[in-house]
């Protein structure tokens, strides 16, 4: 057999469809059938009328209400933002004024402290200089006393040492009286 069962069944279904299409071939597609134009137009007007009233009475008021609420919210937000901006500007102005005052106070305190330190330093320097001058004068006085004592003692030391030095260097013995007369003559 050249034709299979599946092909035969398919061609049977195809044949039925073709016959059915031929039956309805003389008919017009209902929306394009002008014999029913009045009823189609009637239902079109009713449908669009219903949609118009539904949109006009339900949708548009809701949208309008939403837009109005949003506009009011935006206006209140803008007013609030302006108020907050003014408050912030006021706070910034107060902050800058207080900062300037604090800077001036800090500068005044620094100047005052600097002047006090300079005065204290001057006083301490004068006290130290006075103390050092006094100590220097005392030291010079002590040096003068020591020098005078040393000068006075030089004569007695010379009287003791010179006879021995002369004896060792020259080998001659010198009397203490002649050394004493020579030292006294050198002092005058």
UniProtKB/Swiss-Prot annotation:
Listed GO MF terms: proton-transporting ATP synthase activity, rotational mechanism; proton-transporting ATPase activity, rotational mechanism
Residue ranges crossing the lipid bilayer per the database entry: 41-61
Superkingdom: Bacteria
Entry keyword annotation includes DNA-binding: no
Subcellular location field: Cell inner membrane
Lipid bilayer topology: Single-pass membrane protein
Database matches in HAMAP family: ATP_synth_b_bprime
Family per similarity comment: Belongs to the ATPase B chain family.
Official protein name in the record: ATP synthase subunit b 2
Gene: atpF2
